[in-house]
């Protein structure tokens, strides 16, 4: 969903501020979201971080705190605007790019309704409210539903 993509962008801002700027654990935390065209309620949001071995536990703790804060509604209007602006700029650039249109059209030949969704991209993102993001964060960022994968060097204890 577009709201999940915008929530991902807000989370990305918070990850950068906390993990890079405040803690210095990593230069670039990254995250992504996935939804399904087939299963309307299916989707997830994930975070990836490359950190030094001694910072793994503290990094998990920081990510948990950020997710809990988002789920508790700690999203400002300024964060929504700062997260939305680059998405709208990417959409504007894509609409001016033949490659983007070729990709969209190739995905729409069997589902022409996708073209309406493409045309509504910018307005959909512009209409997502802070309250919608807070509701989505409360749904998606529940600690009991989270999974962790840690990849360590072979010689790590």
Across the structure, where does each feature detected by a protein language model lie?
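Amphipathic alpha-helical interaction/coupling elements
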Residues: 6, 83-86, 136
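Short, conserved catalytic/metal-binding micro-motifs enriched in Asp/Glu and His
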Residues: 5, 133, 148
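M16 family metallopeptidases and their MPP-like homologs
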Residues: 20-127, 144-153
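Low-complexity, intrinsically disordered Gly/Pro/Thr-rich segments
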Residues: 130-138
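Carboxylate-rich, divalent-cation-coordinating active-site regions
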Residues: 17
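His/Glu-based metal-binding/catalytic segments typifying zinc-dependent metallopeptidases
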Residues: 1-14
């Amino acid at each position: 969903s577009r709201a999940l993509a915008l929530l991902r962008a807000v989370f990305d801002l918070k990850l950068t501020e906390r993990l890079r700027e405040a803690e210095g654990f990593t230069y670039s935390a990254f995250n992504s979201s996935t939804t399904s065209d087939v299963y309307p309620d299916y989707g997830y949001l994930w975070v990836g971080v490359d950190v030094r071995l001694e910072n793994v536990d503290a990094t998990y703790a920081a990510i948990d705190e950020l997710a809990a804060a988002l789920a508790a509604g700690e999203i400002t209007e300024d964060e929504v605007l700062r997260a939305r602006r680059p998405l709208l700029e990417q959409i504007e650039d894509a609409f001016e790019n033949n490659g983007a249109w070729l990709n969209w059209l190739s995905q729409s030949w069997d589902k022409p309704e996708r073209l309406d969704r493409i045309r509504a991209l910018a307005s959909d993102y512009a209409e997502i409210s802070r309250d919608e993001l807070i509701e989505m964060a409360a749904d998606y960022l529940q600690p009991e539903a989270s999974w962790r994968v840690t990849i360590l060097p072979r010689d790590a204890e």
